[in-house]
Amino acid sequence: MTDNFEIKKKILDKIKQYDRIIITRHFRPDGDAIGSTKGLAGILKLSFPQKEVYVLNEDSSQYLAFLGGEDAPIDDEKYADALVIVCDTATTDRISNKKYALGKELIKIDHHIDVKPYGDLSWVDEERSSLCEMIADFWLTFKDELKIDDEAATCIFTGMVTDSGRFKFSSVDGDTMRRAAALLDVGINTEWIYSNLNLDDFDVFKFEAYVYKKMKISKNGVAYIYVDKAMQKKFKLTNEQASNVVSYL
């Protein structure tokens, strides 16, 4: 496994060239999408206080609201001389902020299969358990230049936790745990993080039980279930809660 130092250095150099940086991610965000964008933004704001750094998207997450809200929209003309960084998004059709193309240059940072490459610079590592792990790696690689605080570290750790199945998935390795440990050393409150991640209302618990009872297993061992509008209405689910069904399977 390579450490991707060359592309990471190119990304840092590109960040240094711009006074305005806009960070976005995929729509219907999960913990990794929210954590990576907010965590990266936090690092850049601390490291380069003279720069304008925005996290701009067209949707939000109630489940992950404890990590903070979205930034207010900015005027379209401010994109023209901005660097846009897209996190955790394999293809451009899934980018939440549709104004991303107005930026002067585009960087893609992702850990999904690179089926449709895009961006002036692209750092894709399919072996990583989460995009947040890659952001932690980016910070640690340039630790002498990049600063972090407990707020940014909390966002990044949350994304690592949620995308790795609480560090249970096979994509987790020693590097994953070492990066998580570095975030812990910043001084984050893991008890607070896990308590917020476990705050589901009773309707969600009933839906989860229903999914486990009704899901099907294909001949190839793939678990699946259909979630339609009627089911969503029955359990009083938001679109975000309904789409989270994949995490139960």
Model-predicted regions and their roles:
Residues 39-41, 101-104, 124-125, 178:
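Glycine-rich, phosphate-binding/catalytic loops in enzymes
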Residues 3-10, 88, 140-143:
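Short, motif-level signal for alpha-helix interfacial/capping segments enriched in acidic residues
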Residues 112-179:
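Short alpha-helices
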Residues 48, 68, 142-143:
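A broad structural signal for alpha-helix termini and local helix breaks/kinks
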Residues 24, 85-88, 110, 159, ...:
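Short beta-strand segments
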